[in-house]
Amino acid sequence: MIQPQTHLNVADNSGARELMCIRIIGASNRRYAHIGDVIVAVIKEAVPNMPLERSEVVRAVIVRTCKELKRDNGMIIRYDDNAAVVIDQEGNPKGTRIFGAIARELRELNFTKIVSLAPEVL
């Protein structure tokens, strides 16, 4: 469950290392974001000499959360960290690689480019 002021790791090579959620895209008063939701975030930590810089406002899609994700078949998935992938306005990732496992639910939400770049889909 991601809410405003939550810090997230970045699961791609876009140049950002850590994000802080400042808004959840969707309804005007949504409190929490889950896997597959798009957020507005600010870059808190970045790699030097990369296109994305610190204090830049970006959009990101959440790919991993510590909070459990229940599937229809009864399976529960939980990750060790909260992570997101930086995306552009069309929903394509800004990086060219994805690190770590991501959930299968992203394919159903039309983030197929992120799913194709991921090394493991759970």
From Swiss-Prot:
Disulfide bonds: none annotated. One of its GO terms (molecular function) is structural constituent of ribosome. One of its GO terms (cellular component) is large ribosomal subunit. Keywords: Chloroplast, Plastid, Ribonucleoprotein, Ribosomal protein, RNA-binding, rRNA-binding. GO terms for biological process: translation. The keyword DNA-binding does not apply. It is found in: Plastid, Chloroplast. It comes from the Eukaryota. Signal peptide: none annotated. The keyword RNA-binding applies. Pfam families: Ribosomal_L14 (PF00238). Gene3D superfamilies: Ribosomal protein L14. InterPro entries: Ribosomal_uL14, Ribosomal_uL14_bac-type, Ribosomal_uL14_CS, Ribosomal_uL14_sf. Binds to 23S rRNA. Part of the 50S ribosomal subunit. Belongs to the universal ribosomal protein uL14 family. This is Large ribosomal subunit protein uL14c. The lineage of its organism: Eukaryota, Viridiplantae, Streptophyta, Embryophyta, Tracheophyta.
